[in-house]
Amino acid sequence: MSADITETPNKQLLEQIRSPSFSLFNCIYELKNHTDSIGIQHELVKKLYSFPYEDLQFFIPQFVQLLVTYDSESMALEEFIITYSSRYPHFSLIVFWNLQAYIFELKNEPESRSFQAVRNLITKIQNIMFNADQQTVKAPEFRENFLPALVLCGAVASSVLLPSFKSYCLPMIKAQGKQQKSLVFKLVNFQKSLTKNLTLKNQRMSADIPKGSHSDDETATSSSIKPSLSRSASVPRRNTKKTSLSFSSDESEAYTTDDDDNKTSIELEKDFYKIDLDGLSKEKSANFLEPEENLNVNTAIKSKKRLSTLTSKVMTQPWNGIDGYNVNSQSLPDLSKAEGRDLIPFISSTESETSLLYHNNSISNDLQKNIPRQQKFSPGFDNVYLTKLLQVNYAKNETQFIMALQNISIRLSQVPKEARLSALRAELSIINDTLLPSEIDIPQLLPITSNRNKKYHKILKLNVNEASVLNSAERVPFLLFIEYLSDEIDFNPTTEYNQRIIARKKMNGATSMTVKKINSFSEVADGNFEKENKIKSSTPETVSNIIYNENTEEADLSEMPLDRKTTVSSDSFSPEMLVTPSITEQSKLSNFPSLNTKEVSTKVLADQMRIAAVMLQQLDSSGKANSEQSFLIKNRIVESMIALQDQFDSFDFEKLSQLQSDEPSAGERKLENDFKLGEDWNTKKQRIKKSSAYGHLKNWDLCSVIAKNGDDLPQEAFACQLISMISNIWKKNNIPVWTKRMKILITSANTGLVETITNAMSIHSIKKSFTEHSIKSGENSKGKIFTLLDYFHSVFGSPNSTSFRTAQQNFAKSLAAYSIICYVLQIKDRHNGNIMVDGDGHIIHIDFGFLLSNSPGSVGFEAAPFKLTVEYVELLGGVDSEIYSQFVYLCKQCFKSLRDNSEEIIEIVELMQKDSTLPCFNNGENTSVLLKQRLQLQLNDEDTDQFVENFLIGKSLGSMYTRLYDQFQMITQGIYS
């Protein structure tokens, strides 16, 4: 295997790989081009370990794409991903979420090599993330692979004369030896090509066979996987034959298991966080765990009694007594059986939180009394294991938090618009009560402040009062403000804070203590609840106390909208009940707390809002939502929700309410959203800090994100990645232009978190707000639309002032950069709602739903190379001004720099377009070909300058197509041109 890398044609490549100038991009490029050479693959992956972690994390989507779509016998890249996932928790999370997106994309091809590769890798990643005992579980060093064994024999023989050869080839032999039989994947594709029609027939036959009557494992697998993966991860099940499952949070996780029996023996009763009860083998003794032990975040607790029995069995197992474990057969490890067997860690204060007052410290004191010192760190628990225990705790908390956010948008979409804000506040309050504060941060989005300290941030709470639902025509994105402590947590088991986490987890495992449920959708596993009274400030009169009571635990509430067996399910909540409400129903409506109700806890408010949201949802789905009685009931529920909403801390929505209408246009929605985002960031941050119970902590900080869902999120993330790469090229070549580095964290195929742009407003909102204000004040009787130049005058002063000149130059530098980016990447839909201006005068493009191959309405309406209006040129001082000449010069420099480094952009697009279903790759393999053509690589420098000035700028300046598109958006969507 190593011979192919030392042959004469590859000697030059080997020298390049070992050269210090060999970049990370070069590694990715060569990995794509040498998938058939195991030796070259291993040498390239060996080079990957020499690059900084931040650069490797940036290219995670490309690494996953290489593994999924490029067939290779090499195990090198997979071993690299597994190694880094074990070493860096953020790396494993991002890989995990990217794999979830691929699972959804490949849901209709479960027999394909790509699907099998994704399932195999996601199983290993989940084992790393959720299995604390994995260091005692060793996969077979060698499988039934002839070639690695043969090379190993040769290495042993050659070591007599070449002792160093063994150390050189041993890593490659060990990696290849772990590979499953390559024949398996070949047979899968071979079978698929020969029996395509027969497979479709078998699927239809399997659908007619009753459950449990499968005579053969293959048929059972085919019949269980395919239908299960046919649904979006964010769409609830409404009509399903499995009445025990009414709602699933993410199907891409639920169907990655190899254990077919689990699917038929488990009844799914709760969504979002559920425990697989068949992790223990019924045929094996209680001294070790079943090889198919699963952590399935979407499986349910079937019965409290059964879980209690299972827990008592698990607690008798020695920590290091796992034997015969097959990592490759595992899907999600069972959260109920991992380290301590609790569902969430005890939420205690870190060193930075010691100044907070607690009303009840009895739990902490009891634990300190009852846990012997030697129990915390017994000889069997070395630091490696304890570190892994902390990392697993972090991974659990992180995935639970992200899934909770994912499901909020889904539920908000089922609530009337006028009640969405109330429902959002209720959902966020429940997350605060059940999950936070905890060992959670947001990879990629929360700012990195101290790489040297290797510490992570800790989310304290979601600010309920500042959160808002963003207005959207189709989906329901919402804005979050997250309070966190920077550089707060790590995985060092010797710190006092981490010792408390470990001790409490051991305490829970040793005494089978019941644990309160993780989130608003999980079921309480046992009959007893651990009461934890948390006070969030030393001034309790300013913060609502959180009450934990067995009678008001959300478990009962969450059963209402999710379990079809409950009284509020779609089966029992009939249309007649809605049209003619009973006395009981009327009393429920009348029992909503009024505006004058005092001392109502946050939890009670959240519960009441959840009930109201469920009733509204059932009302709309009853089929009689348009009747007069239903209309009256709906109004009554909405009024109650608004009353409940006002019982949270106050928030000024007076101006916002003036903007709202029954069916707002896109322009009105954009202005409304900009109002929510437009407040000066530092002012908002200081205001929230003063009102926060945690604001006095020295490392307190605030960030804002937008939770979105939609099919174009992976495409937007890819566009942001391309823009970052282009910006890096310009920075490396010292070209003084400016772009905004936007970040999008993909958490599934159609959900994610988007970094917000602070201190900026869309050009549409600027024009609309200034124009309407001038009309109302009598200064603009003719209704003339304000221009950007008018805006710059009002914000930055006179044209001769230093602030105006600085803002003008900032506008020119950013305009040049985004102009070239829009042309090269063919970014379309460039109306003024998708272009922003920040507080320094920079222009910023957002919303990259159309690029490379696709355009709005599949019509090439925007035929100009990029958007360069007469208004932009007017702001630059006209075509004869010095600033305009600077803009033209920067455009030329940017374009020539991209041409000189064109292989980076072209190759990344070529890599990602293979077998992709993203709309931006509608042209297939021609996508990268057309990109290369746009860069005009055949031109010399002089001709390139002429091309930029005469073609790109000349055809864009005042283009008729641009004016027509802006007018079209103005007429149809109300977006100012």
Curated annotation (Swiss-Prot):
It catalyses: a 1,2-diacyl-sn-glycero-3-phospho-(1D-myo-inositol) + ATP = a 1,2-diacyl-sn-glycero-3-phospho-(1D-myo-inositol 4-phosphate) + ADP + H(+). Keywords: ATP-binding, Kinase, Nucleotide-binding, Nucleus, Transferase. Residues 845-869 are annotated as: Activation loop. Disulfide bonds: none annotated. Residues 826-834 are annotated as: Catalytic loop. The keyword Thylakoid does not apply. InterPro entries: ARM-type_fold, Kinase-like_dom_sf, Phosphatidylino_kinase_fungi, PI3/4_kinase_cat_dom, PI3/4_kinase_cat_sf, PI3/4_kinase_CS, PI3K_accessory_dom, PI4KB-PIK1_PIK. GO terms for molecular function: 1-phosphatidylinositol 4-kinase activity; ATP binding. Residues 679-960 form the PI3K/PI4K catalytic domain. Pfam families: PI3_PI4_kinase, PI4KB-PIK1_PIK, Pik1. Residues 1-125 form the PIK helical domain. Residues 220-233 have a biased composition (Polar residues). It is an enzyme of class 2 (transferase). It comes from the Eukaryota. GO terms for biological process: filamentous growth of a population of unicellular organisms; Golgi to plasma membrane protein transport; phosphatidylinositol phosphate biosynthetic process; single-species biofilm formation on inanimate substrate. Residues 205-261 are annotated as: Disordered. It is found in: Nucleus. Residues 685-691 are annotated as: G-loop. Residues 250-261 have a biased composition (Acidic residues). Belongs to the PI3/PI4-kinase family. Type III PI4K subfamily. The C.albicans mating-type-like (MTL) locus contains, in addition to the genes for the regulatory proteins (MTLA1, MTLA2, MTLALPHA1 and MTLALPHA2), a and alpha idiomorphs of a phosphatidylinositol kinase (PIKA and PIKALPHA), a poly(A) polymerase (PAPA and PAPALPHA) and an oxysterol binding protein-like protein (OBPA and OBPALPHA). PIKALPHA is not represented in the genomic sequence of strain SC5314 because that haploid assembly includes the mating type a allele of this locus. This is Phosphatidylinositol 4-kinase PIK1alpha.
